[in-house]
Amino acid sequence: MDDIDRKAISLLMDATLMSEDEIERTLKILRNMARIKKRKEKNLKSIRDVLDYWACQAYKSSMKA
Protein backbone atom coordinates (compact mmCIF):
# COMPACT_ATOMS: atom_id res chain seq x y z
CA MET A 1 0.00 0.00 0.00
CA ASP A 2 1.53 3.30 -1.08
CA ASP A 3 0.83 6.94 -0.19
CA ILE A 4 -1.86 7.31 -2.86
CA ASP A 5 -3.74 4.35 -1.37
CA ARG A 6 -3.52 5.75 2.15
CA LYS A 7 -4.71 9.19 1.11
CA ALA A 8 -7.61 7.78 -0.92
CA ILE A 9 -8.74 5.52 1.91
CA SER A 10 -8.57 8.44 4.32
CA LEU A 11 -10.72 10.56 1.98
CA LEU A 12 -13.28 7.77 1.72
CA MET A 13 -13.46 7.31 5.47
CA ASP A 14 -14.10 11.05 5.94
CA ALA A 15 -16.75 11.12 3.20
CA THR A 16 -19.57 10.14 5.55
CA LEU A 17 -19.33 13.54 7.23
CA MET A 18 -19.24 15.58 4.01
CA SER A 19 -21.92 17.62 2.29
CA GLU A 20 -23.06 16.74 -1.23
CA ASP A 21 -20.76 19.33 -2.84
CA GLU A 22 -17.78 18.09 -0.86
CA ILE A 23 -18.52 14.52 -1.90
CA GLU A 24 -18.64 15.51 -5.59
CA ARG A 25 -15.25 17.24 -5.27
CA THR A 26 -13.84 14.26 -3.40
CA LEU A 27 -15.03 11.87 -6.13
CA LYS A 28 -13.25 13.96 -8.77
CA ILE A 29 -10.07 13.88 -6.68
CA LEU A 30 -10.38 10.11 -6.21
CA ARG A 31 -10.88 9.51 -9.94
CA ASN A 32 -7.77 11.56 -10.72
CA MET A 33 -5.79 9.68 -8.08
CA ALA A 34 -6.99 6.37 -9.54
CA ARG A 35 -5.81 7.44 -13.00
CA ILE A 36 -2.37 8.22 -11.57
CA LYS A 37 -2.26 4.87 -9.77
CA LYS A 38 -3.30 3.00 -12.93
CA ARG A 39 -0.56 4.69 -14.96
CA LYS A 40 2.05 3.72 -12.34
CA GLU A 41 0.92 0.10 -12.10
CA LYS A 42 0.29 -1.37 -15.52
CA ASN A 43 -1.23 -4.61 -14.17
CA LEU A 44 -4.42 -2.83 -13.03
CA LYS A 45 -7.37 -3.42 -15.36
CA SER A 46 -9.36 -0.23 -14.89
CA ILE A 47 -9.85 2.88 -12.81
CA ARG A 48 -13.04 1.33 -11.42
CA ASP A 49 -10.98 -1.58 -10.03
CA VAL A 50 -8.76 0.88 -8.18
CA LEU A 51 -11.77 2.73 -6.76
CA ASP A 52 -13.36 -0.58 -5.70
CA TYR A 53 -10.16 -1.62 -3.94
CA TRP A 54 -10.01 1.67 -2.04
CA ALA A 55 -13.68 1.43 -1.07
CA CYS A 56 -13.18 -2.10 0.22
CA GLN A 57 -10.12 -1.09 2.25
CA ALA A 58 -11.91 1.95 3.69
CA TYR A 59 -14.84 -0.26 4.71
CA LYS A 60 -12.54 -2.78 6.39
CA SER A 61 -10.69 0.01 8.22
CA SER A 62 -13.92 1.59 9.42
CA MET A 63 -15.15 -1.76 10.76
CA LYS A 64 -11.93 -2.21 12.76
CA ALA A 65 -12.32 1.18 14.47
From Swiss-Prot:
Signal peptide: 1-19
Superkingdom to which the source organism belongs: Archaea
Assigned keywords, A-Z: Signal
Protein name (record): Uncharacterized protein MJ1145
